[in-house]
Amino acid sequence: MPSLKDLKNRIASVKATQKITKAMKMVAAAKLRRAQEAAEAARPYSQRMGAVLANIAQAVGSDDGVSTLMTGTGKDDVHLLVVCTAERGLCGGFNSQISRFARDHVRSLLAAGKTVKIYCVGKKGYDSLRREFGALIVERTEFREVKRVAFENADTVARKVISMFDKGEFDVCTLFYSEFKSVISQIPTARQLIPAAVGDAPAASSSAAAIYDYEPDAASILSDLIPRNIAVQIFRALLENAAGEMGAKMSAMDNATRNAGEMINKLTLSYNRQRQAKITTELIEIIAGAEAL
């Protein structure tokens, strides 16, 4: 049984931890609002970019001048998985659920006889995936010193991905991230980057498409837009991740604060019981000594 001093020290330690978790919750809540606004603002732009690509692709048709970023290599033997996670922990299962989702995808591709390469964006994803798939990780990018994600960060990743594709290092590229739904809900998501998946984007009807005139030509515009679209989709993923991370962190720190409060109550109760028992024992000894006299 711990002594009164040990219990007192433990209570003080838990109270100090509770102050930290409470402060972290407040910081996460403040950052969440900004991150959520940024993620929600990026969605319409990202979706509209896909619609524009779909419209131009419809106008181009099957022209030979279309970039291979749009059409692909014609094969799907080598897959590059761009896995986006956070740089830090203390955010519940946020990072682990993205890594687990990507890990399951890797296993299914390997089982199908495909070659898999992994590009880790974020420290936590790298730390998780390297244990099982360290040999498959070909590239990694971290933003430890970045306080707020900027488009330049996404563009850096996009340029590396496009460079790898131009060198013939993969056939298909898929982006993994966590889509922010609410403070307690972040959904692991996979989005194909290369070949550009614009089939689901709302394209204009043929009558509406006829009014557009492209200069110098639709194929050239499409070739310029596709690399930017890749950067835009990665930027959206990073913003969604930032909002999801703050939401998960706020929830995790709230749970930790409440758990610390419950532990303090239990330890305080144990401390008071032991202290009362000690006082009672001392009183009995005093009374017994007085009677002996």
From Swiss-Prot:
GO molecular function: ATP binding; proton-transporting ATP synthase activity, rotational mechanism
Membrane topology category: Peripheral membrane protein
Gene3D superfamilies: 3.40.1380.10, ATP synthase, gamma subunit, helix hairpin domain (1.10.287.80)
Presence of keyword Membrane: yes
Keyword Cell inner membrane: yes
GO cellular component terms attached to this protein's record: plasma membrane; proton-transporting ATP synthase complex
Keywords: ATP synthesis, Cell inner membrane, Cell membrane, CF(1), Hydrogen ion transport, Ion transport, Membrane, Transport
GO biological process: proton motive force-driven plasma membrane ATP synthesis
Compartments it resides in: Cell inner membrane
Cited SUPFAM superfamilies: ATP synthase (F1-ATPase), gamma subunit
Highest taxon, organism lineage: Bacteria
Pfam families, per the entry: ATP-synt (PF00231)
UniProt cross-references to HAMAP family, sorted A to Z: ATP_synth_gamma_bact (MF_00815)
Subunit details: F-type ATPases have 2 components, CF(1) - the catalytic core - and CF(0) - the membrane proton channel. CF(1) has five subunits: alpha(3), beta(3), gamma(1), delta(1), epsilon(1). CF(0) has three main subunits: a, b and c.
Family designation: Belongs to the ATPase gamma chain family.
Functional summary from the UniProt entry: Produces ATP from ADP in the presence of a proton gradient across the membrane. The gamma chain is believed to be important in regulating ATPase activity and the flow of protons through the CF(0) complex.
Name of the protein in question: ATP synthase gamma chain
Source species taxonomy: Bacteria, Pseudomonadati, Pseudomonadota, Alphaproteobacteria, Hyphomicrobiales
